[in-house]
Amino acid sequence: MARPLEQAVAAIVCTFQEYAGRCGDKYKLCQAELKELLQKELATWTPTEFRECDYNKFMSVLDTNKDCEVDFVEYVRSLACLCLYCHEYFKDCPSEPPCSQ
């Protein structure tokens, strides 16, 4: 049985592969693919009042090489930043883990 971290890594890779390629390059997310991924896979963490300009801004932050797409490295960096944010947020919480083991 896979451990939680192994499952998390597989989920990161599989989620990227599920959404990438609909606009062309199967190794990158275009803005529409990124928007759909955020809305469906991080629905509780993506504000419902996000406007198109918010997605444009988010895309420009993630797209570090400015090719108008998010490659896997840029995607993983964004998830790493999200993990860092969550770690900071939860580090002063009670010692009970936020998820069951």
From Swiss-Prot:
Changing C99A: Increases affinity for calcium. More than half of the arginine residues undergo citrullination by PAD1 and PAD2. Arg-51 is specifically citrullinated by PAD3 and promotes tetramerization. Ca(2+) 2 binds at D63, N65, D67, E69, E74. Gene3D superfamilies: EF-hand. Zn(2+) binds at C83, C86, H87, C93. The modification N-acetylalanine is found at A2. GO terms for molecular function: calcium ion binding; calcium-dependent protein binding; transition metal ion binding. Skin specific, specifically expressed at the inner endocuticle of hair fibers. The modification Citrulline is found at R51. SUPFAM superfamilies: EF-hand (SSF47473). Its main location: cytoplasm. GO terms for cellular component: cytosol; Golgi apparatus; plasma membrane. Coiled coil: none annotated. Pfam families: S_100. Homodimer and homotetramer for the citrullinated form. Binds both calcium and zinc. May be involved in calcium-dependent cuticle cell differentiation, hair shaft and hair cuticular barrier formation. This is Protein S100-A3. It comes from Homo sapiens (Human).
